[in-house]
Amino acid sequence: MTSSKIEMPGEVKADPAALMASLHLLPSPTLNLEIKYTKIFINNEWQNSESGRIFPVYNPATGEQICDIQEADKVDTDKAVRAARLAFSLGSVWRRMDASERGHLLDKLADLVERDRAILATMESLNSGKPFLQAFYVDLQGVIKTLRYYAGWADKIHGMTIPVDGDYFTFTRHEPIGVCGQIIPWNFPLLMFAWKIAPALCCGNTVVIKPAEQTPLSALYMGALIKEAGFPPGVVNILPGFGPIVGAAIASHVGIDKIAFTGSTEVGKLIQEAAGRSNLKRVTLELGGKSPNIIFADADLDYAVEQAHQGVFFNQGQCCTAGSRIYVEESIYEEFVRKSVKRAKRKIVGSPFDPTTEQGPQIDKKQYNKILELIQSGITEGAKLECGGKGLGRKGFFIEPTVFSNVTDDMRIAKEEIFGPVQEILRFKTMDEVIERANNSDFGLVAAVFTNDINKALTVSSAMQAGTVWINCYNALNAQSPFGGSKSGNGREMGECGLREYSEVKTVTIKIPQENS
C-alpha cells in the first residue's frame, strides 16, 4: 500500500490520537517545493493578467513571501466568462459529452490528486499554515472523497414521468444551470475548491472560480490537474485576485448564471445584493458561525471535553463550524472547565511541518490582530481568562490556545465569530433555558449536544436553529450528507442535496393521440 492510498478512521478531525498513531505512515513533506503555477488559468491555458499586476503570497508560519501571483481583474473575469460560456454552448464537446464520461473525468481528477497528495498537502501547509499531518490525512482525504462521490452521481441524475390529466405525455429533465461563479475561502483552500467544482461539473455546468487571495496556490495547481485529466478548455477557469475586484465582478456579471460563496456574512450580503441587481442569478451562501455546543451532566465527561476541544481548536480555530459557545450544565461546570484548561495547555503549537504539531499559525496579521483584540475584549468585559490569551513570541502569526470561563451571553466573545483558537465556556441550568440561549444568535450553521439521554438529544436537536446538529460528536462532516446554514446563508452543499443547487428542472409535455393508463 502506498502512502497516498492510506485511509484513516472516521471522524479524524476529532481523533488526534488516530492521526498521531499513523505518523509512521505519513510521507515526508515535499522539500524545496517548486511553485510552478502562478498565472491565471483560462481556457486550459496559463495567462498573465491583462493589467500586468501581481500580488505577493506569504507563509503565515514565518511571515515570509512565497512567490508573486498574477492578479486578475474585471477584464480577466470577462475573458474567463467568455471561455466558460463557449464551453457550455450547445453542441460543444462538454455539452455533448456523456454523463458517464463526466463522472470518469472527475474520477481521473481524484486519481491525480491521490498521485500528488504529498505535494498538495505540502502546498496547503506552506500557504495556509495548517499542520501537514492534518492537510494530508484530513483535507486531502476530503478532496478525494468529494471528487469520487460526485463522479458516481454523474450518470444517475434523472427526471421522472408524470401522469398528467388529458392526452399528454409529460416528463422532467434535470439540466445544468450554465456558467457558475464560485468564490472560496482561505481556511480550507483545496477542500472548498473540491466542494464547489465537483457538484457543478457533475451536473454539466462550467465554472469560473476565485480562490482567496491569501491561499491561491493549491487551486492553481488543480488547474494543471484538471487539464491533465482531460476536461475540455473553458470548463474550469481559475482567477486569483481580490474580493472587491474579482469577487465583485463575478457576483455582478450577467454572463454568470449562478454564484456560490463561502465566507463572511458581511461579504455574503454584498454578493446576494449584486446577484439581484444584475441578472437575478441563483445564489448559494455558506456563511459564518458562532455554534453552540451543549454539554449535559449525563454526558461522558472526558469524551465531551476532548470533542469540545477539537470542535473549537481544529484548524487553528479557523472553522465556520467551530463550537465556540460551549454551554455546560451547572453541576459539572467547574470540572469541565478544569479539564478543558488542562487539555488546552497540552496542545502543541509549532511549525506546520513538525508531525507532532497540533496547531499552526493564524492565516495573516489582520486575523491575528482581530483575535487578540477580541481576547482583550473578553478580559475587559469580565470573563475569566483561564489560559493563553497572547501571541507567541516568534516569527509568524501564532496565538496561544486560549480558554475563557464565566462567559455570559452579552459579551463580544460570546456573540462574534472569532475564527481563532479561543474557547468560551458558559453555564446553564435547564434544557429549556439553554435551547433559548443557543438559538439567540445571528448565526445558525451547526450545533451539537452531548448527552446519554436520547430524549434530551432528540429534543435539543429538533429545537436547534441550525443546518446541522451533531449528537455526541463534532465536525462529523462527509461527502454524502448535506451541509449548510439555517440563518448562516442559504442552500446546501454536499450530498444529493448539493446537486439541486447546480441543476434546473425542465418540464416537457407532448400531445399524444390518446392517454392510456
Swiss-Prot record:
Associated pathway: Cofactor metabolism; retinol metabolism
Tissues expressed in: Expressed in the high vocal center (HVC) which integrates auditory and motor activities and constitutes a nodal nucleus on the song system.
Subunit structure: Homotetramer.
Name recorded for this polypeptide: Retinal dehydrogenase 2
Native organism: Taeniopygia guttata
Gene it is expressed from: ALDH1A2
Reactions accelerated catalytically: retinal + NAD(+) + H2O = retinoate + NADH + 2 H(+); all-trans-retinal + NAD(+) + H2O = all-trans-retinoate + NADH + 2 H(+); all-trans-13,14-dihydroretinal + NAD(+) + H2O = all-trans-13,14-dihydroretinoate + NADH + 2 H(+)
GO CC, alphabetical: cytoplasm
Similarity comment: family membership: Belongs to the aldehyde dehydrogenase family.
An MF annotation (GO) of this entry: retinal dehydrogenase activity
Subcellular location as annotated: Cytoplasm
The entry's keywords: Cytoplasm, Lipid metabolism, NAD, Oxidoreductase
InterPro entries given in the database record: Ald_DH/histidinol_DH (IPR016161), Ald_DH_C (IPR016163), Ald_DH_CS_CYS (IPR016160), Ald_DH_CS_GLU (IPR029510), Ald_DH_N (IPR016162), Aldehyde_DH_dom (IPR015590)
Site positions for Transition state stabilizer: 187
Active-site residues (renumbered): 286 (proton acceptor), 320 (nucleophile)
Disulfide linkage: none
GO biological process annotation, one example: protein homotetramerization
